[in-house]
């Protein structure tokens, strides 16, 4: 019910109050979570794992935040439309096909391109770039650009002492 209710509130302030007081999330100042109709938040509070979204981070519409395993997103992170952050999976060799959960940690100044998928247990280092459509199955080192399925190193980003601020707040978001 939370997904359907909160996705349609056209007020940044009310949504952020909901995240903090009802879901127990920590959302930094200036963070923009553009929910719309297509973002889903699963496992929001019952697991006891924390969700933290840093200052000036932008999460665009159409993203899937599967938070049961825990989700830590740094500051000044740009998450493009359609990105999936999936902290859970299944033990495929277990007779009962049991599920398991691992946290996702995303460092500061990371850019995740459209429709990329980040799996549980992954850490993405500061300043890294995940190209559109990539499926990240291993940790990504700082300032590394990865792409493909599964994601592989494409190049290194020449970024020293990043200081930019993401500032994206549409009128009715």
Residue spans of the language-model regions?
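Left-handed beta-helix
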Residues: 29, 34-35, 40-41, 49, ...
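Short, functional N-terminal and low-complexity linear motifs
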Residues: 19-24, 45-47, 75-81, 95
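A short, acidic/glycine-rich surface segment
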Residues: 40-44, 91-97
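A transmembrane-helix-recognition feature enriched in membrane-embedded lipid enzymes
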Residues: 1-30
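Residues at secondary-structure transition points
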Residues: 9, 22, 48, 68, ...
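C-terminal segments of enzyme domains that contribute to small-molecule binding surfaces
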Residues: 96-120, 149-173
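Active-site/binding-pocket entry motifs
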Residues: 84-85, 91, 152, 160
């Amino acid at each position: 019910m939370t997904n359907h209710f909160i996705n349609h509130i056209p007020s940044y302030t009310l949504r952020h109050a909901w995240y903090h007081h009802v879901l127990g999330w920590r959302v930094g100042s200036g963070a923009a979570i553009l929910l719309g109709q297509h973002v889903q938040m699963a496992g929001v509070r019952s697991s006891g794992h924390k969700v933290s979204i840093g200052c000036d981070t932008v999460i665009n519409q159409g993203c899937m935040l599967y938070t049961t395993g825990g989700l830590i997103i740094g500051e000044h992170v740009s998450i493009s439309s359609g990105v999936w952050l999936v902290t859970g999976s299944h033990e495929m060799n277990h007779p009962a096909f049991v599920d398991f959960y691992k946290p996702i940690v995303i460092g500061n100044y990371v850019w995740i391109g459209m429709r990329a998928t980040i799996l549980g247990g992954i850490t993405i280092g500061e300043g890294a770039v995940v190209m559109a459509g990539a499926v990240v199955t291993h940790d990504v080192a700082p300032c590394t650009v990865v792409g493909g399925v599964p994601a592989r190193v494409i190049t290194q980003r020449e970024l020293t002492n990043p200081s930019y601020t993401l500032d994206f707040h549409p009128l009715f978001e």
